């Protein structure tokens, strides 16, 4: 079930909120758990056992870690069981066929692909990391063991963040999970509705609209009747315009989903962590990764980078740790060599900044932002090079070897205003405008009402538009 659909907006969400608010305090987590299962199983019921297995593995290992509090060996074995079980399922469903096909390509073997796993269980990359963060934190004694399986299940499958984040650690919500009375206040619900509306507007008014520019250039894989330019016919300037449009679409799509999730979490009484902080205003790649998908970066930093030694064991070890994290980041995004190359691409950039570039970037004012945006857009070109209808080699030849073809003037006329608005919405200027409007209760309410009404009109009139990060 997608947030930006009629069935979610006008049926599931209001019914779920009504049941949740009307439920007795002690039953709120049960209602949340059951409604979240309905949300997940709506389109992915065949993968429900996978999620249930992950919940049970980490729940039981958590209990075992408490049971063997003084037995270091037993605790380590239980942690390894949780890691092997959780990561093993993620590997099987997401990476097994990729590994087999890669072995076939490299060694000329004839391993047949595993049948039945061509479709990835929805959200598995996200909820696997959430369950693992709980077990690791219990092992490290950073959080107490959760004894109530319904409460633990509600944490794992909580529908606002289940499918595409933000990645919520157990300690982020554990206190609120055990507050049964006065979990939320009217102000929280109001703030949550505001955040949800902004997220919905980001998705349907900006992401989907600007994504149409990229579609006009590259085409739609499942709609051959739709007219488009085609990558082979596009000029170099038009291809750059298309990749910039894709970069904007990806940001508004993912940050919009995250904002909707954070808003719904607030309506339920939970404070989810921020996931984006205007990444396109960054003045370095290092800063970009502090602002983009912050919960994923934070997860890798806490559970991989720091345990490997972090910044404590000299520059060479820092570079190695960075290599591991960026490689895993690329692998996490998808079972494809494009994503692995994308992760290694960012490793090289981050390593160069750590070695010598960062001091120079901090001294600059304009050029560091141009440098960062250029490299980020090139990175997204590697990202989209995996999509249907995009030939990776042709895309990069078009980007870096000047070629003729259809020019961008027509598209600039059609999308110029939208591009300008999108660029402004990538900066803190939009937040300053909102603070100005929200000083007055009437203008605040009218702004939200207009955004919600227009967004709903677009939802009603549009076809299905899934979130891009559902693929990961």
Features from the language model and the residues they span:
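Membrane-embedded transmembrane alpha-helical bundles that form the catalytic cores
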Residues: 1-471
């Amino acid at each position: 079930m997608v947030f930006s659909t009629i069935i979610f907006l006008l049926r599931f969400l209001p019914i779920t909120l009504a049941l949740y608010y009307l439920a007795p305090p002690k039953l709120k987590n049960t209602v949340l758990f059951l409604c979240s299962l309905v949300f997940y199983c709506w389109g992915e019921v065949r993968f429900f056992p996978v999620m249930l297995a992950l919940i049970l593995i980490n729940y039981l290992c958590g209990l075992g870690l408490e049971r063997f509090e003084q037995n270091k060996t037993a605790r380590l074995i239980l942690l390894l069981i949780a890691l092997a079980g959780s990561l093993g399922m993620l590997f099987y469903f997401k990476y097994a066929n990729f590994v087999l096909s890669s072995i076939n390509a490299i060694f000329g073997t004839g391993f047949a692909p595993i049948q039945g796993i061509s479709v990835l269980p929805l959200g598995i990359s996200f909820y696997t990391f959430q369950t693992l963060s709980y077990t690791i934190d219990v092992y490290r004694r950073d959080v107490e063991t959760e004894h109530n399986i319904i409460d633990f299940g509600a944490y794992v499958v909580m529908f606002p963040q289940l499918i595409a984040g933000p990645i919520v650690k157990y300690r982020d919500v554990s206190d609120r999970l055990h507050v049964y009375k006065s979990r939320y206040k009217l102000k929280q619900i109001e703030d949550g509705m505001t955040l949800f509306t902004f997220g919905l507007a980001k998705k349907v008014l900006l992401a989907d609209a600007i994504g149409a520019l990229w579609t006009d250039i590259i085409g739609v894989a499942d709609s051959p009747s739709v007219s488009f330019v085609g990558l082979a016919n596009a000029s170099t300037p038009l291809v750059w315009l298309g990749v910039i449009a894709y970069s904007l679409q990806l940001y508004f799509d993912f940050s919009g989903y995250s904002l909707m999730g954070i808003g719904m979490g607030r309506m339920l009484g939970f404070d989810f962590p921020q996931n984006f902080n205007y990444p396109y205003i960054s003045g370095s790649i290092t800063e970009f990764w502090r602002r983009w998908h912050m919960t994923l970066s934070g997860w890798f930093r806490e559970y991989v980078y720091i345990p490997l030694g972090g910044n404590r064991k000299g520059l060479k070890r820092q570079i190695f740790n960075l290599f591991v994290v960026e490689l895993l980041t690329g692998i996490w995004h998808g079972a494809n060599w494009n994503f692995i190359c994308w992760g290694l691409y960012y490793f090289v950039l981050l390593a160069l900044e750590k070695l010598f570039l960062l001091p120079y970037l901090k001294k600059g004012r304009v050029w560091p932002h141009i440098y960062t945006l250029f490299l980020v857009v090139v990175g997204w070109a590697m990202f989209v090079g995996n999509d249907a209808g995009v030939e990776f080699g042709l895309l990069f030849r078009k980007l870096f070897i000047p070629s003729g073809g259809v020019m961008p003037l027509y598209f600039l006329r059609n999308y110029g205003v939208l591009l300008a608005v999108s660029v402004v919405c990538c900066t803190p200027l939009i937040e300053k405008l909102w603070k100005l409007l929200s000083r007055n209760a009437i203008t605040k309410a009218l702004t939200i009402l207009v955004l919600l009404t227009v967004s709903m009109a677009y939802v009603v009139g549009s076809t299905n538009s899934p979130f891009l990060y559902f693929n990961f």
